[in-house]
Each structure stands twice: as structure tokens, then as C-alpha cells.
């Protein structure tokens, strides 16, 4: 199964401690300061999980983890984690990014593609990092595969 908005929202109810204005936020999914952005991100995951968007928004991964929570996630990951190996891969990944951006109109400052694109880009150049610090390169690879 591909990650849905509900799975994403549930994942935020994991006991994390969030503070706002000196107070503890009991549930970021319902708190007035966060609930709208939680709903906006959930909408992105709902879009990717629609059967008609499966190929546009996700790609098959070989390690069975999908980058989104384990084998139960159907061994697919969002294209934001895809490492392009050809011009066609790059164009396909861009189409997925455009589709998500059109959903939020560019007004979601830190959409899930933000960090994933940074991590994926660094992962593609990990040989440069490895030349300076093999342990950091291995940590990056572990993070990407997670």
C-alpha cells in the first residue's frame, strides 16, 4: 500500500513533544497552529495514493522498503526519492514534483519534497562525501535507504 494522507496523519501521533509559545502541543494534527498544514500534506499523500496517480507519483524500489515505512507500503516510494539515471527519469520525477506543487500552489513552504530532494541529491554525490568522511557517507546512505 502506498502512503496515504491518513497514514501520514497517524504517523504524527507518535508521542513526539512539540512546544509552541512555551506550552506543550498535545496533538499537532488537531492544534489550530498545525492542523491546516497537516491537512495540506495529507492531501498530497492522498493524491499520490489514488490508483490513477500511482505511476506518476511513485516508483518501484528494489529493497522492499519504499522509503516510507517498510514492506507493507507495497515496495514503492514517492518519486521525490527517485535517483534519476536518465533524462527520462529526470522528466518523470519533475512531472511528479509539478503535480504536487500544483496541488498546494507553491504555498507549502516545506512540502515533503523539500528535504527528500536535498537528501536524494546528496546521496547521488555521496562519493564526494566518502572521500572526506566515509562514516558520514555511510550515515547518509543509511538515511536515504530508510
Regions found by a protein language model. Give the residues of each.
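Acidic/polar, glycine-rich intrinsically disordered N-terminal extensions of enzymes
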Residues: 1-67
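Glycine-rich flavin
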Residues: 59-146
Amino acid at each position: 500500500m502506498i502512503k496515504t494522507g491518513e497514514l501520514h496523519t497517524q504517523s504524527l501521533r507518535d508521542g513526539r513533544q512539540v512546544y509552541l509559545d512555551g506550552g506543550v502541543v498535545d496533538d499537532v494534527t488537531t492544534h489550530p497552529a498545525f492542523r491546516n498544514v497537516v491537512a495540506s500534506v495529507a492531501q498530497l499523500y492522498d493524491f499520490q495514493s489514488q490508483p490513477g496517480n500511482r505511476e506518476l507519483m511513485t516508483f518501484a524500489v528494489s529493497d522492499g522498503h519504499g522509503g516510507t515505512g517498510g514492506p507493507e507500503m507495497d515496495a514503492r516510494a514517492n518519486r521525490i526519492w527517485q535517483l534519476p539515471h536518465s533524462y527520462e527519469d529526470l522528466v518523470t520525477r519533475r512531472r511528479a514534483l509539478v503535480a504536487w506543487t500544483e496541488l498546494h500552489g507553491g504555498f507549502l513552504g516545506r512540502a515533503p519534497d523539500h528535504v527528500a530532494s536535498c537528501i536524494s541529491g546528496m546521496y547521488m554525490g555521496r562519493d564526494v562525501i566518502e572521500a572526506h568522511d566515509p562514516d558520514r557517507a555511510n550515515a547518509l546512505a543509511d538515511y536515504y535507504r530508510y
